Design a protein with these regions (language model features):
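Conserved "HGTGT" condensation-loop signature of ketosynthase/thiolase-family condensing enzymes
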Residues: 1-193
Length: 193
């Protein structure tokens, strides 16, 4: 990997505090799991007043695990599962609901890359080479979500370059707090305009 340059227009991060879902219709809100609610909250904050189509990328190590565990219990106890519960247990259900809510018709990807889910999803979002909303959310080890509005016209200039020196990985919160983000594949750091 040489280097990729892009801009970050906005970052929204939450560990479960200040989840605002008031703009979501009640019927849709009821369909969201815990991880879906926190993801939807950060995506809505990042997306803001944008309108029209935008690429979407969602990443999660465990996805809708909470819902899957519930379905397994239902199957064990009643020998059947809720069709609605089943349909919302898929990995891309949250990003699908977001696209419905915001009337987005462009494609979206849902990434599960184990412990590298965040870095794989962010790389996928950057590789779109156009305005993209990226969201990572999980609820197993800790409840958290980060959404990033990637742009090529507006925002803070960022460079993604290969981690050829094999620097040790850190958490994306380092980048949020002004440092750089390091994962096994790449390094993400701010660049001069």
């Amino acid at each position: 990997m040489n280097k990729l340059e892009f801009r970050i227009k906005k970052i929204s991060y939450s560990q479960g505090e200040n989840i605002d879902l008031s703009s979501i219709p009640m019927m849709m809100r009821r369909k969201l799991s815990t991880v879906g609610k926190i993801a939807m909250s950060t995506m809505l904050d990042c997306y803001g007043e944008n309108s029209g189509d935008i690429k979407l990328v969602y990443a999660s190590r465990y996805g809708e695990l909470e819902r899957v565990v519930k379905l397994i219990s239902q199957k064990k106890e009643n020998n059947e599962v809720s069709p609605t519960g089943f349909s919302f247990s898929v990995h891309n259900s949250t990003i699908g609901l977001f696209s419905l809510l915001k009337n987005i018709h462009s494609s979206y990807n849902s990434i599960a890359g184990g412990e590298d889910s965040f870095s794989a999803g962010l790389l996928d979002a950057v590789m779109n080479n156009e305005k993209t909303l990226f969201c990572y959310a999980d609820s197993v080890d800790k409840l958290e979500s980060v959404s990033i509005l990637i742009d090529y016209q507006e925002g803070e200039k960022v460079v993604m370059k290969g981690n050829s020196e094999h620097l040790p990985s850190n958490n994306f919160s380092e980048f949020i707090n002004g440092g750089r983000y390091v994962c096994p594949l790449y390094i993400l750091e701010r660049a001069d305009d």
